From Swiss-Prot:
Signal peptide: none annotated. Residues 89-101 have a biased composition (Acidic residues). Induction: In freezing-tolerant gramineae, by cold temperatures. Water-stress induces the expression to a similar extent in all species tested, abscisic acid (ABA) to a much lesser extent. This is Dehydrin COR410. Pfam families: Dehydrin (PF00257). Residues 106-245 are annotated as: 3 X 21 AA repeats, Lys-rich.
Length: 262
């Protein structure tokens, strides 16, 4: 009996332990699943981030590579066009007839002189004929000033690009005078010649007659004084406004005063 009880108790204890173990196992399984899911999510996030980085980097490199290829192609095209233009400018095609009568085109390199001539303005290359265009010679310019002044004309001649100035011969004075007279005739009031203007006398108002003062009679004490008096009398008679009567009265008064003093 005791053995049965011990076995039953032992079996009961084992069953209880198993129940506890199973209970703990369920909780552990639940917790373990949650942790595993979280770990998987973290791993997935890390993997996706790495994939994004790995995908984006090659795209940038590809774009840079494409830009470099485009630049290289443009540069190569420009280089080819410049080389082709230089080769075409440096070379000329010539038609040569063979012995069989066939026309063959051959390329001939241009010289430095021909290149320079081709770059000059006004140069035309037509079927091997080089024509250099020179400007036409300009007409001689005449310089004239109005208002009575006539300057000498300066003739300018342009020959083969070199400018030469030649002074015109001096104009004689007679021609200059004739030109001045023509201008004066065209002006209003200038029909009279300067000689006629100089010949016209200038009229001024006649000045008023000026009466000369009568000189005082001198005392006569000798025959020479009488002769002087006679000359003075003649001169006084010729003067305008002289009256003999007044002069004689003055002379008589002077002699009368002189006599008593003697």
């Amino acid at each position: 009996m005791e053995d049965e009880r011990s076995t039953q108790s032992y079996q009961g204890g084992e069953a209880a332990e198993q129940v506890e173990v199973t209970d703990r196992g369920l909780l552990g399984n639940l917790l373990g699943k949650k942790k595993a899911e979280e770990d998987k999510e973290k791993e997935e996030e890390l993997v996706t981030g790495m994939e994004k980085v790995s995908v984006e980097e090659p795209e940038v490199k590809k774009e840079e590579h494409e830009d470099g290829e485009k630049k290289e192609t443009l540069f190569s095209k420009l280089h080819r066009s410049s080389s082709s233009s230089s080769s075409s400018s440096d070379e000329e095609e010539e038609e040569v007839i063979d012995d069989n009568g066939e026309v063959i085109k051959r390329k001939k390199k241009k010289g430095l002189k021909e290149k320079l001539q081709g770059k000059l303005p006004g140069h035309k290359d037509t079927e091997g004929e080089h024509v250099t265009g020179l400007p036409a010679p300009a007409a001689p310019a005449s310089v004239q000033t109005h208002g009575g002044h006539h300057d000498t004309d300066v003739v300018v001649e342009k020959i083969d690009g070199d400018v030469k100035t030649e002074a015109a011969p001096a104009v004689p004075e007679e021609e200059k005078k004739g030109f001045l007279e023509k201008i004066k005739e065209k002006l209003p009031g200038g029909h009279k010649k300067p000689e006629d203007a100089a010949a016209v006398p200038v009229t001024h108002a006649a000045p008023a007659p000026v009466h000369a003062p009568v000189p005082a009679p001198e005392e006569v004490s000798s025959p020479d004084a009488k002769e002087k008096k006679g000359l003075l009398g003649k001169i006084m008679d010729k003067l305008p406004g002289y009256h003999k009567t007044g002069e004689e009265d003055k002379a008589a008064a002077a002699t009368g005063e002189h006599k008593p003093s003697a």
